[in-house]
Structure formats: structure tokens, C-alpha cells
Amino acid sequence: MIEKVDYEKVTGLVNSTESFGSVDGPGIRFVVFMQGCQMRCQYCHNPDTWAMKNDRATERTAGDVFKEALRFKDFWGDTGGITVSGGEATLQMDFLIALFSLAKEKGIHTTLDTCALTFRNTPKYLEKYEKLMAVTDLVLLDIKEINPDQHKIVTGHSNKTILACARYLSDIGKPVWIRHVLVPGLTDRDEDLIKLGEYVKTLKNVQRFEILPYHTMGEFKWRELGIPYPLEGVKPPTPDRVRNAKKLMHTETYEEYKKRINH
């Protein structure tokens, strides 16, 4: 266990930070993008976070990152705070525990954005994960695909651990926002959208269910890294397809929380 006095000294490999994030949790947020991710999502807009070694990544202490975040605290109001994303943030769990512990000591709202690929339902893993959850107010859980075969096509990995994490978070009552990226021809099949909606209904802790329309804003990063972009020529979903997905998955069921946040 990390001693409380050492939280500021715990280091992590950080790709970048964003001062005024507005889509990574409630309110205005300071967002930390961690380095490293095992998934290879075809639509990834941060492929520069995949490898643990990257020229942009910097080893930083939790104390240093927290001090940077505090510079923007006045903009957070009653709903904002700190979000840690990636990459996959849980690859560096000690850093997350340290940063979020510093935040909670100051009463700051904490959000974890995760794909949950690292999740393991084992005593050793859960011992540390429970410490993280103790200082995490909200989890943004990305469910890329409910269909296991399609999930492997989309990400290169099974969705078994993701669904196990979703069930665990439901069992402990941790507030969660479920997110699904809608990609034409890849993650927008009606039968799978219906199944995902049915699955989410079985979870007891979902405050919000978001459809994130696919965009091409990260395509240039693939070119910079010399990696062929697998979705070349694929356009964002039409408004009709987005409405269709929301209808099939009954996302409006979870809109009350959104209304409370915005008023």
C-alpha cells in the first residue's frame, strides 16, 4: 500500500493534459491523458498513447500534476473536477490512486475514463482496484461492442474483462456513465445496439448512457506515426443513425442525470 505521505511523489507516465475538458465527465474538468494502452481500436483518436515509450510522454509525479490541476480550480464550479483518461489509465493504477487521493483530500470530484481491459476479478487485482474506487467518484466506461466477435475486430481484444468490470461496478454501486462510439459499418449494427441496450438495463448504477458519434479528428495522428488508418473514407454517422442508436438503446432512460447537471 502506498503511504499517504508519499502520494505526491508517486510517478506516472503522462502523455498530455487538457485544462478545460467539457466532455470527460460533469462540468469543466482538468483531464490527464496517461501513456499506454493495450487496445488497438480502429477509430482511436489518440494512437500516440498506445506505446509506453513515446517522445511526447513525460514521467511526472502525482503532486506535480495535482498542482497543475489546481491552477484551474476556480473554473470547475460545483460540478467540475479532475478526469484521468488515456491511453488506458488503469495500467498505472498506483499513480491514479495517488492523484485521486490528493484530490479527495481537497474535496475535488474525480472521474476515471477507462476501457477496463486490464480488469481482473482476482483478489490481488481487486485489492488495489478497491483502493482506486474508494477515491473515484465516477467511472466513464467505454463499451466498444457487446458482440464479442465484433469487439475483437474493433479493438483486437475480447470484451470479457470489460463486461466483468461493468458488472463489478454495478455490484458495488459505483456511479457510471456508459459510452459507445458509433462508427458506420463497424459498431452501428441494429441487432448489437439492441443487445447493448438490454445489457446496460441490467446494471444498477448507470447514470448516463452516451452515444459518441465517430469523428476523424485523430486521423492525422495515425499518419504522423506512419500507421495506416483502417477507417480511411469512413464518414461520421448521419443524425438519423445517431437517433436510431439512441432509440434502440433507450438512452433517454438515463437523461434525468444530465438534466440535473445542466441546471
UniProtKB/Swiss-Prot annotation:
All disulfide bonds of the chain are: none
Q: Which Gene3D superfamilies match?
A: Aldolase class I
Give the EC class as a word: oxidoreductase
- InterPro entries named in the record: Aldolase_TIM, Organic_radical-activating, Organic_radical_activase, PFL1_activating, Pyruvate_for-lyase_activase, Radical_activat_CS, rSAM
Describe its function: Activation of pyruvate formate-lyase under anaerobic conditions by generation of an organic free radical, using S-adenosylmethionine and reduced flavodoxin as cosubstrates to produce 5'-deoxy-adenosine.
Name the positions where [4Fe-4S] cluster binds: 37, 41, 44
Q: Name one GO molecular function term.
A: metal ion binding
What is the protein name given in its UniProt record? Pyruvate formate-lyase-activating enzyme
Q: Which reaction does it catalyse?
A: glycyl-[formate C-acetyltransferase] + reduced [flavodoxin] + S-adenosyl-L-methionine = glycin-2-yl radical-[formate C-acetyltransferase] + semiquinone [flavodoxin] + 5'-deoxyadenosine + L-methionine + H(+)
